[in-house]
C-alpha cells in the first residue's frame, strides 16, 4: 500500500503538469521482412490521445484530427526528362535531388487542406505537395517544379508515394487507428511512422515510432555479401553466370 501511495504521489505532479495533449502511438509491426515471395504488407498504426485536464473533448465544433505519415529513408535521385528528336526518344534535361524520401505515405482523418494552412503543411511536410525535396542545381523555380511533379508522379505510379484522406478512424476522440499498405517494391532501411494531433488548425502534439524494413533469407545473404565484399560478390556473380551459360549450352547440344 505504501509503494502504491508513493507511486501515485510521484505521478500526480506529472499529471498536473500535462498542459498539452499527448499521443501514445504504436504500430502492428516494428520489423517488416522482405523475402522472395514478399507481395506487400498491411501496417496498422494505432494509439491513444491523452487530453490534459480542462481540455474540451472532441465535438462537431472543435473536432480532433490525427495525421499519420510513414517515411522511408532519404536517398539521392536523378530525374531525367526525355525528348523526342527525329522519332527517337533521347535524354534531355535532368535534375538531381540530394535528398528525397524513398517512400512516403500519409493518412488522415480528414483531407489535409481542411486541417492546417499551407505554412503548417510545409513545416511538417504534410502532403505530397508539401514535401521539402532538395535539388542540387540552381535551376529556375518553374523547372524545379516540373521535375518535382515528375518525381512524385513516378513514385505514385510505383505505389511508393500516396495519400489516404479519411483513412484514420478516431473513436470517442480518444482512440485512433489507420491501415496503410506497404507495396512489394518497398525499399529497405529505417522507416519512421510520425503521428500528428491537430485541432483548430494547429499541431498540438506529435510522436514517432521506428520501423525496420529488411531483407530476409537468401535475399538478405546476397545483400550483405554485396555490401561487405563487393569484389568477391562480383567474381561470384560472373562465375555463376559463366557456369549457368555453359550448363545451358551443354543441355542444348544434347537435345
Residue ranges and their predicted role:
Residues 8-18:
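Hydrophobic h-region of N-terminal signal peptides that target proteins for export
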Amino acid at each position: 500500500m505504501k509503494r502504491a501511495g508513493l507511486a501515485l504521489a510521484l505521478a500526480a505532479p506529472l499529471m498536473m503538469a500535462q498542459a498539452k495533449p499527448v499521443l501514445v502511438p504504436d504500430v502492428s509491426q516494428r520489423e517488416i521482412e522482405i523475402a522472395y515471395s514478399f507481395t506487400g504488407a498491411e501496417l496498422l498504426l494505432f494509439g491513444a490521445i491523452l487530453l490534459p485536464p480542462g481540455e474540451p473533448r472532441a465535438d462537431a465544433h472543435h473536432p480532433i484530427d490525427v495525421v499519420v505519415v510513414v517515411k522511408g529513408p532519404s536517398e539521392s535521385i536523378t530525374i531525367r526528362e526525355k525528348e523526342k528528336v527525329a522519332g527517337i526518344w533521347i535524354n534531355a534535361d535532368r535534375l538531381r535531388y540530394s535528398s528525397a524520401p524513398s517512400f512516403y505515405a500519409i493518412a488522415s482523418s480528414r483531407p489535409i487542406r481542411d486541417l492546417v494552412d499551407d505554412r503548417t503543411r510545409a513545416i511538417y511536410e504534410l502532403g505530397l505537395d508539401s514535401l521539402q525535396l532538395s535539388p542540387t542545381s540552381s535551376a529556375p523555380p518553374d523547372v524545379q517544379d516540373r521535375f518535382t511533379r515528375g518525381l512524385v508522379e513516378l513514385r505514385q505510379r510505383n505505389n511508393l508515394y500516396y495519400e489516404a484522406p479519411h483513412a484514420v478512424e478516431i473513436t470517442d476522440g480518444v482512440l485512433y487507428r489507420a491501415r496503410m499498405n506497404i507495396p512489394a517494391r518497398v525499399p529497405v532501411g529505417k522507416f519512421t511512422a510520425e503521428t500528428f494531433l491537430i485541432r483548430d488548425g494547429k499541431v498540438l502534439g506529435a510522436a514517432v515510432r521506428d520501423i525496420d524494413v529488411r531483407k530476409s533469407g537468401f535475399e538478405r545473404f546476397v545483400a550483405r555479401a554485396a555490401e561487405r565484399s563487393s569484389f568477391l560478390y562480383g567474381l561470384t556473380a560472373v562465375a555463376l553466370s559463366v557456369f549457368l551459360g555453359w550448363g545451358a549450352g551443354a543441355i542444348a547440344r544434347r537435345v
